Amino acid sequence: MMQDVSSSPVSPADDSLSNSEEEPDRQQPPSGKRGGRKRRSSRRSAGGGAGPGGAAGGGVGGGDEPGSPAQGKRGKKSAGCGGGAGGGGSSSGGGSPQSYEELQTQRVMANVRERQRTQSLNEAFAALRKIIPTLPSDKLSKIQTLKLAARYIDFLYQVLQSDELDSKMASCSYVAHERLSYAFSVWRMEGAWSMSASH
């Protein structure tokens, strides 16, 4: 019996069947692994698209499309911001000419006041020169006119103290003024003016 079993050859049909049964068993695990990898990769890709990165990518892609509503809203917002900035610039530009005009008016008013002050001062000095007896060669400046006026007042005080004028002559203002003018001119020419002015 042992010889029959050992010596009995295996038919090629049985070998082909056994080989065919073994081959699918060997081939199934790799195919299953490959399918699992493909499914995992597809799940990962789907998850990446649905995740934060996918959402961000989709948002950026949607913003890049020219006809997307998101871009239209952003464009409107940016246009509104630009309009607001332009309005602010126009308001500031409108305020600057007003300040410049105010400065100009202030300068004009200051110039007018200075001219009035100078004119009134010149008129006062002209009136003082008419009162003070002067020589034909006198070309007095303002400070010289003030000094001469002070000396003339001092001279009048001395005249009143000396009682050189008579009561009759003093009653006539015109004659008294003429005599005082002459006496003051003589007093100046004698050097009293130069001596007193030097002090």
Swiss-Prot record:
SMART domains named in the record: HLH
Gene3D superfamilies in the cross-refs: Helix-loop-helix DNA-binding domain (4.10.280.10)
Residue ranges, compositional bias (Low complexity): 1-18
GO annotation, biological process: cell differentiation; muscle organ development; negative regulation of DNA-templated transcription; rhythmic process
Presence of the UniProt keyword Nucleotide-binding in the record: no
GO cellular component, one term: nucleus
One Pfam family linked to the record: HLH
GO molecular function: DNA-binding transcription factor activity, RNA polymerase II-specific; protein dimerization activity; RNA polymerase II transcription regulatory region sequence-specific DNA binding
Annotated spans, Sufficient for transactivation activity: 158-188
Superkingdom of origin: Eukaryota
Biased composition (Gly residues): 46-65, 80-96
Database matches in InterPro entries: bHLH_dom, E-box_TF_Regulators, HLH_DNA-bd_sf, TWIST1_bHLH
Keyword match Transcription regulation: yes
Entry keywords, A to Z: Activator, Biological rhythms, Developmental protein, Differentiation, DNA-binding, Myogenesis, Nucleus, Repressor, Transcription, Transcription regulation
First-listed, main subcellular location of the protein, grouped into a coarse class: nucleus
Biased composition (Basic residues): 34-43
PANTHER family, per the entry: BASIC HELIX-LOOP-HELIX TRANSCRIPTION FACTOR, TWIST (PTHR23349), TWIST-RELATED PROTEIN 1 (PTHR23349:SF64)
Assembly: Efficient DNA binding requires dimerization with another bHLH protein. Homodimer or heterodimer with E proteins such as TCF3. ID1 binds preferentially to TCF3 but does not interact efficiently with TWIST1 so ID1 levels control the amount of TCF3 available to dimerize with TWIST and thus determine the type of dimer formed.
Annotated function: Acts as a transcriptional regulator. Inhibits myogenesis by sequestrating E proteins, inhibiting trans-activation by MEF2, and inhibiting DNA-binding by MYOD1 through physical interaction. This interaction probably involves the basic domains of both proteins. Also represses expression of pro-inflammatory cytokines such as TNFA and IL1B. Regulates cranial suture patterning and fusion. Activates transcription as a heterodimer with E proteins. Regulates gene expression differentially, depending on dimer composition.
Official protein name in the record: Twist-related protein 1
Organism the protein comes from: Microcebus murinus (Gray mouse lemur)
